UniProtKB/Swiss-Prot annotation:
InterPro entries: DnaJ, DnaJ_C, DnaJ_domain, DnaJ_domain_CS, HSP40/DnaJ_pept-bd, HSP_DnaJ_Cys-rich_dom, HSP_DnaJ_Cys-rich_dom_sf, J_dom_sf. Zn(2+) 2 binds at residues 166, 169, 188, 191. CXXCXGXG motif repeats lie at residues 149-156, 166-173, 188-195, 202-209. Its cofactor is Zn(2+). Signal peptide: none annotated. It comes from Burkholderia thailandensis (strain ATCC 700388 / DSM 13276 / CCUG 48851 / CIP 106301 / E264). The keyword Iron does not apply. This is Chaperone protein DnaJ. Binds 2 Zn(2+) ions per monomer. Participates actively in the response to hyperosmotic and heat shock by preventing the aggregation of stress-denatured proteins and by disaggregating proteins, also in an autonomous, DnaK-independent fashion. Unfolded proteins bind initially to DnaJ; upon interaction with the DnaJ-bound protein, DnaK hydrolyzes its bound ATP, resulting in the formation of a stable complex. GrpE releases ADP from DnaK; ATP binding to DnaK triggers the release of the substrate protein, thus completing the reaction cycle.
Amino acid sequence: MAKRDYYEVLGVAKNASDDEIKKAYRKLAMKYHPDRNPDSKDAEEHFKEAKEAYEMLSDSQKRAAYDQYGHAGVDPNMGAAGAQGFGGFADAFGDIFGDIFGQAAGGGRGRGGPQVYRGADLRYSMEITLEQAAHGYDTQIRVPSWASCGICHGSGAKPGTKPETCPTCHGQGTVRMSQGFFSIQQTCPKCHGTGTYIPEPCVHCHGSGKVKETKTLEVKIPAGIDDGMRIRSAGNGEPGINGGPSGDLYVEIHIKPHPVFERDGDDLHCQMPIPFTTAALGGEIEVPTLAGRASFTVAEGTQSGKTFRLRGKGIKGLRSSIAGDLYVHVQVETPVKLTDQQRDLLKQFEKSLAEGGPRHSPQSKSWFDRVKSFFE
């Protein structure tokens, strides 16, 4: 089933302000929130749809991409409501619902159990060469991660003590509160959804039960990846809370500038100087490519700025079975630091051109004719 237009989902115009988008989303989220519609699959789908639309339209960069390209212009891994369920909701929308739903919006809830939270996603920026992007690249990266505290063995409590049942929620992790005409379930303010509290925290991890560590991960960069694309490593983000799933790691790729080529999608461009004699007489020219050397024929009388297209000498994109093209933009080079003999030869050559009339320099004749008519 095709996705609905995000503006249609929220019921706002395409030129709606950020405040209008926020108000429209809040109205829909309150109407379809699972706490108000616990047994309604339809309400759950409406809630997810509104959540996804708001996440895209409340971010200026995502909104610009969506306005230009529609659903194809936004990353399906970013903000996809189905991927995370309701996990991460508090992080993205706590400013809207913090006063109404509290932290309970941040995760799922077991029946009668403490709140379960999905771990936060992590970002890692990585630079690679154009050659690595074109051919693919396997590497290792070291990223900060969390591990169970070795002093308290993950309990968060000082050795010799243990966590105790929270007296406020009686181990449930949530408390029920009434606000206006409806009752809502809210994360326990004392234990923050864990169902327990720690009278004497571990001094090593400060009661969190986990400590920072560095983790080494294998990353496979696919051939054809482009600058700014992200690689998702599922489950390698921060760990969840109370048994919640771990977040994901997103490796963002940045391609270093290349000394020869400029990339444009799957195509490559390069500027190539050629001797003026080759431009005048024509000949075979060798040009570098990412797969080795290639050659092409320069026609007699080639002018500076002429572009030659070498089909299939570009980059094979991620979703393409055919490589792009290489565009060679030739620049006719004027010789410098001439010897006296070379100067004399060029003067003789110039004289022979003048004797032959304008047929040797049609562009110059055309230009001077235009200038002459301009002053008449």
